[in-house]
Design a protein with these regions (language model features):
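Signature of N-terminal electron-transfer/Fe-S-associated modules in redox systems
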Residues: 1-202
Length: 202
């Protein structure tokens, strides 16, 4: 059967409206939902899960406002279908910090005034998170290149790059402090009441 106005068949319309049950993890929480196979990931997050921190901007994968992390990879939520997240782990801006405190990136953005209207900020933060997970000590030029896929009409980008540099520096210092603490614990004498030969040699 063919639609006389648009020339589309009923079977094609049925395919567009087809639904599929998916299971995925969003910010550490197991989720199971039935979704339209044509629904984009950003729409699923916003409309089905109420995670409205992922913003919908250009809808063409250009502006970066809808950026989320899927299995450790930065993706555009407006170009990714929800069904493509089947069995995967999705991280949104809402999952950037699970402690109730500002994440190291959020704190740096706040200190450097790296936001104004805030529309691009969630995508910026998640892109910066992906950068920090991928590269340990990126140069300022590398940071600029990595962030070039995220558009901001307000800040001029200078403060954003400054904030990311600050977050990277603090993260590195925190990692060094944690490593030192672990080393001290491993060298601490046993409190079990017996002393091994290896401890005596220390």
């Amino acid at each position: 059967m063919t639609d006389s106005v648009f020339g589309t068949s009923a079977s094609a319309t049925d395919a567009v409206e087809q639904r599929m049950r998916i299971q995925l993890e969003v910010n550490g929480e197991r989720i199971e939902r039935e979704v339209l196979v044509r629904q984009h990931l950003v729409d699923f997050l916003r409309e089905e899960l109420g995670l409205t921190g992922s913003h919908l901007g250009c809808e063409h994968g250009v502006c970066g406002a809808c950026s989320v992390i899927v299995d450790g990879e930065l993706v555009r939520g407006c170009l990714t279908l929800a069904v493509q997240a089947q069995g995967k782990a999705v991280e949104t801006i809402e999952g950037l910090s699970d402690s109730g405190q500002l994440d190291i990136l959020q704190q740096a953005f706040l200190e450097h005034n790296a936001m104004q209207c805030g529309f691009c900020t969630p995508g910026m933060l998640l892109t910066a998170r992906a950068l920090m997970q991928e590269l340990l000590e990126p140069s300022r030029e590398v940071i600029r290149e990595y962030m070039s896929g995220n558009y901001c009409r307000c800040t001029g980008y200078q403060a954003i790059v400054d904030a990311i540099e600050t977050a990277i520096r603090r993260s590195k210092a925190l990692g060094a402090a944690n490593s030192l603490g672990s080393a001290k614990e491993s060298l601490a004498p046993s409190t079990s009441g017996t002393v091994s030969a290896s401890e005596v040699s220390l």
